[in-house]
Amino acid sequence: MVQCLVVDDDSRILNYIASHLQTEHIDAYTQPSGEAALKLLEKQRVDIAVIDIMMDGMDGFQLCNTLKNDYDIPVIMLTARDALSDKERAFISGTDDYVTKPFEVKELIFRIRAVLRRYNINSNSEMTIGNLTLNQSYLELQVSNKTMTLPNKEFQLLFMLATRPKQIFTREQIIEKIWGYDYEGDERTVDVHIKRLRQRLKKLNATLTIETVRGQGYKVENHV
């Protein structure tokens, strides 16, 4: 799954973009400042960044320059500043595209995909781990000639775990990514979804299993 870093000091914009990226099967990592974004990148790989210009501390121009020079990842500027001089400075800083606010989120996603294609970054809808193939477009699991369609949340949860084998995810991390920041339900819903996924994987005879890490969360293991 494509990993997209979104940096903006407006939490509403962060949540808005993240929710739409999620529906497009793009994993969003949101940060409120340039400094926080760089701290995240010390431990998390991303494929592309969407960043604001006007932020406290490190501004978008500085952040863009650092992302290009130190991490060599594509950047899209998303900003209310529409002066030609700002656009010139942004492209000098290394941005690959420039989108002004207010913006259409669908257009932003089109531009993200276009930049990814330019960099030959894979945003295909399928991934295979062990003997299991996951198809995001159809929410399907396949092992040999057996195919199973999952409910949306179950598929998103399994796909998130499968993209990072052996990485432990807490319930809080899972809820934030799959159900969103404003989810107010019981966190035990994660356990219910995990139980169902285990049953489905067993029925398919998948080599992938979901393991419980006591006191921490869940991870996937591939038994080949």
From Swiss-Prot:
Gene3D superfamilies (alphabetical): 3.40.50.2300, 6.10.250.690, Winged helix-like DNA-binding domain superfamily/Winged helix DNA-binding domain
Ranges in coiled-coil conformation: none
Protein name: Heme response regulator HssR
CDD domains: REC_OmpR, trans_reg_C
Residues of the Response regulatory domain: 3-116
Organism: Staphylococcus aureus (strain bovine RF122 / ET3-1)
Post-translational modification remark: Phosphorylated by HssS.
A biological-process GO annotation: regulation of DNA-templated transcription
InterPro entries linked to this entry: CheY-like_superfamily, OmpR/PhoB-type_DNA-bd, Sig_transdc_resp-reg_receiver, WalR-like, WH-like_DNA-bd_sf
Pfam families from the UniProt entry: Response_reg, Trans_reg_C
Modified sites of kind 4-aspartylphosphate: D52
Main location: cytoplasm
DNA-binding region: 124-222
Gene Ontology terms for molecular function: phosphorelay response regulator activity; transcription cis-regulatory region binding
GO CC field: cytosol; protein-DNA complex
Keywords, in A-Z order: Activator, Cytoplasm, DNA-binding, Phosphoprotein, Transcription, Transcription regulation, Two-component regulatory system, Virulence
Function description: Member of the two-component regulatory system HssS/HssR involved in intracellular heme homeostasis and tempering of staphylococcal virulence. Phosphorylated HssR binds to a direct repeat sequence within hrtAB promoter and activates the expression of hrtAB, an efflux pump, in response to extracellular heme, hemin, hemoglobin or blood.
Localization in the cell: Cytoplasm
Keyword Cell wall biogenesis/degradation: no
Highest taxon in the source lineage: Bacteria
